[in-house]
Curated annotation (Swiss-Prot):
Keyword Transferase: yes
Lineage of the species this protein comes from: Eukaryota, Metazoa, Chordata, Craniata, Vertebrata
Tissue spec. comment: Expressed at highest levels in adult brain, and expressed in embryo. In the adult brain detected at high levels in the anterior olfactory nuclei, piriform cortex, septal nuclei, bed nuclei of the stria terminalis, hippocampal pyramidal cells, dentate granule cells, amygdala, hypothalamic nuclei, parabrachial nucleus, and nucleus of the solitary tract. Expressed at lower levels in adult ovary and heart and at very low levels in testis, lung and muscle.
Protein name: Calcium/calmodulin-dependent protein kinase type 1B
Any one of the GO CC terms: cytoplasm
Pfam families in the cross-refs: Pkinase
CDD domains linked: STKc_CaMKI_beta
């Protein structure tokens, strides 16, 4: 699918802008209706003046999205360029974010979590087959296609994705709580970083809090580097051994021993009937509400500590700037708003 940048003097001649859906580091996302039709899109509006020095990030996102066509991945439908802006017309998904939907459910089981993870694994496996590493998988980037109960889950936000031309990538990228050990060590890394992030997401989906967290940045990084986490009682008492085994294979310290997406898809917790059908909504939703309140997990953070850690490992200034643009931070599980979270 080749999407050329279509030149326009005024985007309002192409789309009727309805309302603001959200905003990012250097863009706004608007609900827009295509002129002459009823078709709606999520229009990502990027001021060119905000792109100075960051052109490569956006060009990379476009290059990645042009290669993708998968039912569980938000599609790029069109690209427009005006004298002042670049516009990415994205497939509109209307079902809301992952945590919000879990909180709204009447019941929620391991089987539901397994089904969710299986869909995301399928999408990420597809990306990996194209040589694409997402690099920023986290719950906020998992959206439901529609508001209906049987809606599929969609992977979004490819701003940090990278086409892996060789065997490994080098720039530190991601979100601290989801970042793989090899990335923290500033070693060359590849597709396995996405599998690690899916391990963190799977863990959260089953208990409502993250596997790695601490008020101290060095301790947080130490936990990740050692792959040090627990299946705490009572939160994991009603979770199957199969689920725990699945997570252990995804949160494997050694990327060479870590499951690939294909191996994860074949695990019985995903492909078989090993997932329990017991309702865990009460405990999971309580923990999600405590640890991922919208005001916390939407909040951008100052990535000073992460970058200090990277500097100690000798990363180049160019890589450090890329990392600074990549970082997003969220709240420490179980802490009040007055405390300073480090995960």
């Amino acid at each position: 699918m080749l999407l050329l940048k279509k030149q326009t003097e005024d985007i309002s001649s192409v789309y009727e802008i309805r309302e603001k859906l959200g905003s990012g580091a250097f863009s706004e996302v608007m609900l827009a209706q295509e002129r002459g039709s009823a078709h709606l899109v999520a229009l990502k509006c990027i001021p060119k003046k905000a792109l100075r020095g960051k052109e490569a990030l956006v060009e990379n996102e476009i290059a990645v999205l042009r290669r993708i066509s998968h039912p569980n991945i938000v599609a790029l439908e069109d690209v427009h360029e005006s004298p002042s802006h670049l516009y990415l017309a994205m497939e509109l998904v209307t079902g809301g974010e992952l945590f919000d939907r879990i909180m709204e459910r009447g019941s929620y089981t391991e089987k539901d979590a397994s089904h969710l993870v299986g869909q995301v694994l399928g999408a990420v496996s597809y990306l990996h087959s194209l040589g694409i590493v997402h690099r920023d998988l986290k719950p906020e980037n998992l959206l439901y296609a529609t508001p209906f109960e049987d809606s599929k889950i969609m992977v979004s936000d490819f701003g940090l994705s990278k086409i892996q031309a060789g065997n490994m990538l080098g720039t530190a990228c991601g979100t601290p709580g989801y970042v793989a050990p090899e990335l923290l060590e500033q070693k060359p890394y590849g597709k396995a970083v996405d599998v690690w992030a899916l391990g963190v997401i799977s863990y959260i989906l089953l208990c409502g809090y993250p596997p790695f967290y601490d008020e101290s940045d060095p301790e947080l990084f130490s936990q990740i580097l050692r792959a040090s986490y627990e299946f705490d009682s009572p939160f994991w008492d009603d979770i199957s051994e199969s689920a725990k085994d699945f997570i252990r294979h995804l949160l494997e310290r050694d990327p060479q021993k870590r499951f690939t997406c294909q191996q994860a898809l074949q695990h019985l917790w995903i492909s078989g009937d090993a997932a329990f059908d017991r309702d865990i909504l009460g405990s999971v939703s309580e923990q999600i509400q405590k640890n991922f309140a919208r005001t916390h997990w939407k909040r951008a953070f100052n990535a000073t500590s992460f970058l200090r850690h990277i500097r100690k490992l000798g990363q180049s200034p160019e890589g450090e700037e890329a990392s600074r643009q990549c970082m997003t931070r969220h709240s420490h599980p179980g802490l009040g708003t007055s405390q300073s979270p480090k995960w």
